[in-house]
């Protein structure tokens, strides 16, 4: 039985309404609504909304541009609120730390939760590098390799490279070849399937039932890194819906 309580969501600023951002963008850009630039920006805003509301990633910094290195959004992600929420809901138990590291694809992976100060509710934040791919076709190995290459170039001087995670967002699924590649990567990788916004009966965008997080995939290294963090349970039981009322007037990190 899941307890519907998420006392962990600790807030620091005013809540950001991405639906308002989306509506303002649409109203201000009607003349270019058929362009690739418009569609790309609209999907980027949709992704920001889902990262913020569903994964509790705050302080999203849009960096996309000519010299973005393939990254559209950067942010810091603190998973402790998700961990505490999963504890409150009774879907995980407080781990007996430290959890053992595991060698995956020739990489020693030590769970992030080992770095948590559970008593004082302190945990390190992860840097995330987000790429938005509003494609109409499935994501090929080429796209996966490009983001992996960007990750490697940006973390080359960072010995603790697991503290940075690339996230690819697309309305499409990866191809079977892409899935095989993700299994073999020796870096953490999160794939989010977020569909595009669709028009409703009055030709307005349907913000409630479209543009939603439809699923996710963690590769083996990321699964090992987030072992015991409560993230899989947060996603499986959609605990972000239980916590949604707690986030309507405040922001979180």
Swiss-Prot record:
<keyword id="KW-0496">Mitochondrion</keyword>
<protein>
    <recommendedName>
        <fullName>Required for respiratory growth protein 7, mitochondrial</fullName>
    </recommendedName>
</protein>
<dbReference type="Pfam" id="PF10356">
    <property type="entry name" value="RRG7"/>
</dbReference>
<dbReference type="GO" id="GO:0005739">
    <property type="term" value="C:mitochondrion"/>
</dbReference>
<dbReference type="InterPro" id="IPR018828">
    <property type="entry name" value="RRG7"/>
</dbReference>
<comment type="similarity">
    <text>Belongs to the RRG7 family.</text>
</comment>
């Amino acid at each position: 039985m899941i307890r519907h309580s998420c006392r962990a969501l600790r807030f620091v600023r005013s809540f950001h309404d991405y639906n308002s951002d989306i509506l303002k963008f649409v109203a201000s850009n009607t003349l270019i609504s058929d362009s690739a630039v418009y569609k790309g920006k609209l999907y980027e805003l949709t992704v920001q909304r889902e990262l913020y509301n569903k994964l509790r990633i705050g302080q999203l910094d849009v960096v996309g541009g000519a010299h973005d290195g393939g990254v559209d959004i950067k942010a810091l992600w603190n998973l402790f609120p998700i961990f505490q929420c999963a504890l409150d809901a009774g879907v995980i138990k407080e781990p007996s730390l430290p959890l053992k590291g595991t060698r995956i694809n020739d990489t020693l992976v030590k769970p992030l939760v080992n770095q948590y100060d559970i008593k004082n509710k302190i945990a390190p934040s992860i840097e995330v590098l987000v790429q938005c791919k509003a494609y109409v076709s499935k994501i090929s190995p080429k796209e996966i390799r490009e983001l992996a290459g960007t990750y490697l170039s940006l973390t080359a001087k960072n010995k603790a490279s697991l503290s940075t995670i690339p996230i690819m967002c697309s309305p499409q699924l990866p191809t079977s070849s892409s899935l095989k590649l993700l299994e073999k990567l020796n870096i953490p990788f999160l794939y989010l399937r977020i569909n595009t916004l669709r028009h409703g009966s009055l030709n307005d965008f349907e913000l409630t039932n479209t543009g939603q997080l439809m699923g996710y995939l963690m590769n083996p290294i990321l699964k090992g890194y987030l072992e015991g963090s409560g993230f899989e349970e947060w996603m499986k039981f959609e605990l972000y819906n239980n916590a949604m009322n707690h986030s309507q007037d405040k922001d979180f990190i």
